């Protein structure tokens, strides 16, 4: 009986916490679709295509190839695609 009450209180608390911390989504889809449509018409307007910072060939990239401008990171050094 006590365990059931504890579980019910925990579920109610987590549900309330989810609603309190959630973003205001009333106009989320309304603003999302025109932006996506604009990005489909002009792919260069997409934020995903922009690179804020990338490393030139010969610099240390760790194990994340996405940091290199050429997308090639082999043994921890950015490689160039030019042959």
UniProtKB/Swiss-Prot annotation:
Pfam families: Conotoxin (PF02950)
Propeptide cleavage-removed residue intervals: 23-51
MF terms (GO), sorted A to Z: sodium channel inhibitor activity; toxin activity
Tissues in which the protein is found: Expressed by the venom duct.
Disulfide linkage: 54-69, 61-73, 68-78
GO cellular component, one term: extracellular region
Subcellular location: Secreted
Record keywords, A-Z: Cleavage on pair of basic residues, Disulfide bond, Hydroxylation, Ion channel impairing toxin, Knottin, Neurotoxin, Secreted, Signal, Toxin, Voltage-gated sodium channel impairing toxin
Superkingdom to which the source organism belongs: Eukaryota
Major location category of this protein: secreted
InterPro entries for the chain: Conotoxin (IPR004214), Conotoxin_d-typ_CS (IPR012322)
Modified residues (4-hydroxyproline): 57, 65
Signal peptide limits: 1-22
Domain comment, as recorded: The presence of a 'disulfide through disulfide knot' structurally defines this protein as a knottin.
Recorded family membership: Belongs to the conotoxin O1 superfamily.
Function: Delta-conotoxins bind to site 6 of voltage-gated sodium channels (Nav) and inhibit the inactivation process.
Name used for this protein in its record: Delta-conotoxin-like Ac6.2
Native source organism of the sequence: Conus achatinus
